[in-house]
Amino acid sequence: MTHATHRQERDQWSILAWVVVAASLFALMVAAPSRSLASSDELTTEDKKLLAKGELVMKPKNEQRGAYKLFGGQSWQIIDVPASEAWQALKNLSGYKNFIPLATESDVSNQVGKEADVAMRQQWGPIDVKYVLQTTLEAERGAVVFRVDHSKDHDIRAGWGFFRVRPYKNDRTLVSFGALVDIGDGVFVSIVRPAVRKDLLRIPYFFKKHLEAERVGAQVAVD
């Protein structure tokens, strides 16, 4: 699968749904991400069977936290690449534009040790969403946690989240994603909320497709 084909697949998302989900994924509140979100204890025996079949497992969640009406949850996907390869892709913050739908920029700045800022931009027609993420790499856990820099412009009320990759059977990787977001109120929000929830939790699937496309591209280059 070429990069162009992969981007065409991602561009087929509902425009309205992605306008919000794009901002939702990366616009994060100042509070630190909950460690409980990153746990694999939520996976049941049936979930593990579904994962083994190559399916995406999603667990939606709602939570009221102060004035914030949060929704999101967790999702998991097995990827047919070694964990070391998945981690290289995950910690390459400037490469996020390659697997976040409609992303056109992911520029890294102020990188000091494990911390970095990432200026994200998503575009679709006249829609142009920008924000700066404060990210932390946790190599010992194979995780990236992120939150919005609220001193910069942002298009969502609140949220936070993480990516994580771990070794799985037969030299594969279990990728997990979790986020809780408050996208605000209004008639438009109430209409798109179900689609946003679903697409937000599909992020591990799109990460998987990106890595598979990278592998195919590398093999073609060698041949």
Question: For each of these PLM feature ranges, what is it?
Answer:
Residues S39-D41, D47-L50, W124-D171, L180:
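Hydrophobic-ligand binding "helix-grip"
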Residues L174-S176, L180-D223:
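A conserved amphipathic terminal alpha-helix motif
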Residues A86-W87, Y96, T135, V175-F177:
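Hydrophobic pocket/interface hotspot
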Residues W18-A31:
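Bacterial N-terminal signal peptides
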Residues M1-S14:
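N-terminal secretory signal peptides that target proteins for export/translocation
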Residues G72-Q77, A83-E85, H150-S151, V189-V196:
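Second-shell loop/turn segments in exported
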Residues S36-Q111, R202, D223:
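Hydrophobic ligand-binding cavity/cleft-lining segments
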Residues M58-P60, E115-V118, G142-D149:
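Short Pro/Gly-enriched beta-strand edge/turn motifs at strand-loop
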